[in-house]
């Protein structure tokens, strides 16, 4: 069975997007700073050296994506193809007509549990990459998110969009691995059930 993993770069004060996060400025002001560990200067993804490179490789071994509607709409559903894997979008409403041009994108309107089950089935023996603050929060609440990999960036944003703004209750975590690099502290947790 596949595992679901939230991979997220985050400021020390918990922000995954800076102020002014909107469609014309996805990720908000300062967003590139959160991803410099693998995309220097906000440019193309570059495999880092050492242990960060190993994490980068792991991060790209997903077999399906579960992403929130806001996330996929800001990036135009990655043009309908994110490395050839299926993209599942839990949503309370059906997609707009342009999504019909993206056969790998599936909107799931019968709940986060169904969306995750479909994503895990599509992922096979690889993991499901989870994208989006709200979607990750709902997956935690429903008990269908298995692991967190947080790339803690040494910066304080002071505002923007937080990853864990609202949680239904306390969530206990097991530390799987901690890797320190000059650009980030990479924290891998398993969710205790």
Model-predicted regions and their roles:
Residues 1-193:
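Enzymes that bind and transform nitrogen-containing heteroaromatic metabolites
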């Amino acid at each position: 069975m596949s595992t679901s993993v939230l991979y997220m770069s985050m400021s020390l004060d918990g922000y995954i997007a800076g102020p002014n996060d909107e469609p014309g400025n996805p990720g908000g002001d300062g967003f590139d700073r959160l991803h410099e560990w693998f995309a220097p200067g906000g440019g193309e993804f570059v495999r880092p050296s050492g242990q960060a490179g190993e994490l980068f490789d792991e991060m790209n071994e997903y077999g399906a994506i579960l992403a929130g509607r806001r996330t996929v709409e800001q990036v135009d559903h990655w043009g309908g193809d994110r490395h050839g894997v299926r993209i599942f979008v839990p949503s309370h409403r059906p997609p707009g007509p342009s999504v019909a041009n993206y056969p790998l994108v599936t909107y799931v309107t019968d709940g986060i549990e169904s969306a995750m089950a479909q994503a895990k089935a599509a992922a096979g023996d690889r993991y499901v990459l989870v994208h989006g603050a709200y979607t990750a929060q709902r997956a935690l609440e429903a008990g269908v998110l298995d692991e967190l990999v947080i790339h803690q960036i040494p910066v304080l944003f002071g505002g923007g969009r937080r990853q864990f703004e609202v949680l239904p209750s306390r969530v206990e975590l097991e530390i799987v691995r901690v890797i320190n690099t000059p650009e980030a502290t990479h924290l891998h947790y398993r969710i205790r059930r």
